[in-house]
Amino acid sequence: MPELLKQRVETCYQQAETFFKRPFPRPQVSFKLRGQKAGVAHLHENLLRFNLQLYRENQDDFLRQTVAHEVAHLVAHQLFGDKIQAHGEEWQLIMRGVYELPPNRCHNYEVQRRVATRYIYRCPCPESDFPFTAQRHKLVRQGRRYLCRRCREILVYSGETRVE
């Protein structure tokens, strides 16, 4: 686990404990998060998940804003319970009052789109390319059939792939 991020989580908790004059249980921290989300707080599991790739690409802002954002969710839940809104007044109070940060809901990190292989299926219709995902292609190999909406013929794998 990146040591700076672990230290930042601890610093955020120490700030919250000083501000609210009470202890908070420390969460488990995981880097099993991919895609567009920078971080996720699992309230009932006391778990923080972070996107390691976005952390590496945006380290300074990630440590300052994203870590505090996710810790604030756990602190708000432990202080105010289940009935609060995710980015409601209580969470905003913690972001502004404890961490002195803007309560931004979303990051603006550039996210790399995943390279996807498409499997090209065809029917007798002219210009009928049907790019299937790997998941749909696997379903066809397992026996599922897909029909063209125009000619009602079964789509057949052409043997071609395309990277998007």
Swiss-Prot record:
The UniProt GO MF terms for this protein read: zinc ion binding
Q: What's any GO biological process attached to this entry? A: response to stress
- Decide whether keyword Zinc is in the record: yes
Domain spans labelled SprT-like: 14-156
InterPro entries listed in its UniProt record: SprT-like_domain (IPR006640), Uncharacterised_SprT (IPR023483)
Q: Chief location of this protein? A: cytoplasm
Q: Paste the cofactor note.
A: Binds 1 zinc ion.
Q: Which GO terms describe its cellular component?
A: cytoplasm
Which residues are listed for Zn(2+) binding in this entry? 69, 73
* Catalytic residue positions: 70
Pfam families (alphabetical): SprT-like (PF10263)
Entry keyword set = Cytoplasm, Metal-binding, Zinc
Entries under HAMAP family matching the protein: SprT
PANTHER family (UniProt xref): PROTEIN SPRT (PTHR38773:SF1)
Q: Which family does it belong to?
A: Belongs to the SprT family.
What protein does this entry describe? Protein SprT
Organism expressing this protein natively: Pseudomonas entomophila (strain L48)
Q: Which gene encodes it?
A: sprT
